[in-house]
């Protein structure tokens, strides 16, 4: 087995003299594909031809083009404002006019009540 190792060839090729081998042994030899270097050879420089899959940077999906060209304002969700507790007093008026499912006729006026509610707003 003679190894042809030329600096201009990207991969090593094996040359087998046919006159030395018998016809049965010649049929056993197969042509090596160019993408698989022999394991006994020194490592060759990495090229894209040796990689069955391209590098991940080549498989990046480009961003979709926005057809509307509408600008979305950025909202800062991490606010650094100081939180102060401000008590507020609100008047809540409940107007209750209930009519139950009965045969009674309700003749009274709807009740109105005002409650004072103190809430804490952050």
UniProtKB/Swiss-Prot annotation:
This is Kappa-casein. Keywords: Glycoprotein, Milk protein, Phosphoprotein, Secreted. Belongs to the kappa-casein family. The modification Phosphothreonine is found at residue 98. Kappa-casein stabilizes micelle formation, preventing casein precipitation in milk. The modification Phosphoserine is found at residues 102, 119. GO terms for biological process: lactation; protein stabilization. The record marks 58-59 as: Cleavage. Glycans are attached at residues 84, 86, 89, 95, 102, 118. It comes from the Eukaryota.
